[in-house]
Amino acid sequence: MAKVESFTLDHTAVKAPYVRLITVETGAKGDKISNFDLRFVQPNENAIPTAGLHTIEHMLAGYLRDHMDGVIDCSPFGCRTGFHLIMWGEHDTTEVATALKASLNDIINASWEDVQGTDIKSCGNYRDHSLFSAQEWCKKILADGISTDPFERKVI
């Protein structure tokens, strides 16, 4: 089985919340994609409940695109401690952390009408959403401060 980078990361050494560049890969035609670890809570100490995480996912899908170009996808980790962010091109952790901070503030200030994809036609699990949970977790993440380094706190 192929080695997966995220399973080689020492989860006991990181200090969440942070943005970490996992890799930049180059395709056959020279196009580059960047993969980031957006870690919201400390691994093995906390996890965001699925309803809040699901709503954060739906809202980040729009808000991150509002704050920076090149977003391909932002998907939650199965462990519920954060997200993978896949982007076209090369970006640094400061740019991503700044856009993430703005996006989390947008979520805090949002109303239910701002949440996209919350009905049976637009979501595969539309019953599992909580804007209240999403907003409370976003407040905590921002209060803890988003670092541009996973091992040393460099809060933006």
UniProtKB/Swiss-Prot annotation:
Q: Which cofactor does it need?
A: Fe cation
Q: What function is annotated for this protein?
A: Involved in the synthesis of autoinducer 2 (AI-2) which is secreted by bacteria and is used to communicate both the cell density and the metabolic potential of the environment. The regulation of gene expression in response to changes in cell density is called quorum sensing. Catalyzes the transformation of S-ribosylhomocysteine (RHC) to homocysteine (HC) and 4,5-dihydroxy-2,3-pentadione (DPD).
Q: Which InterPro entries match?
A: LuxS_sf (IPR037005), Metalloenz_LuxS/M16 (IPR011249), S-ribosylhomocysteinase (IPR003815)
Q: What is its EC number?
A: 4.4.1.21
Q: Which is a GO BP term held by this UniProt record?
A: quorum sensing
Q: Which family does it belong to?
A: Belongs to the LuxS family.
Task: Describe how the cofactor binds.
Answer: Binds 1 Fe cation per subunit.
Tell me which SUPFAM superfamilies the record gives. Answer: LuxS/MPP-like metallohydrolase
Pfam families recorded: LuxS
Q: What is the lineage of its organism?
A: Bacteria, Bacillati, Bacillota, Bacilli, Lactobacillales
Subunit text: Homodimer.
Which parts of the sequence bind Fe cation? H54, H58, C123
PANTHER family (alphabetical): S-RIBOSYLHOMOCYSTEINE LYASE
Catalytic activity from the UniProt record: S-(5-deoxy-D-ribos-5-yl)-L-homocysteine = (S)-4,5-dihydroxypentane-2,3-dione + L-homocysteine
Gene Ontology molecular functions: iron ion binding; S-ribosylhomocysteine lyase activity
Protein name per UniProt: S-ribosylhomocysteine lyase
- Organism equals Ligilactobacillus salivarius (strain UCC118) (Lactobacillus salivarius)
Swiss-Prot/TrEMBL keywords? Autoinducer synthesis, Iron, Lyase, Metal-binding, Quorum sensing
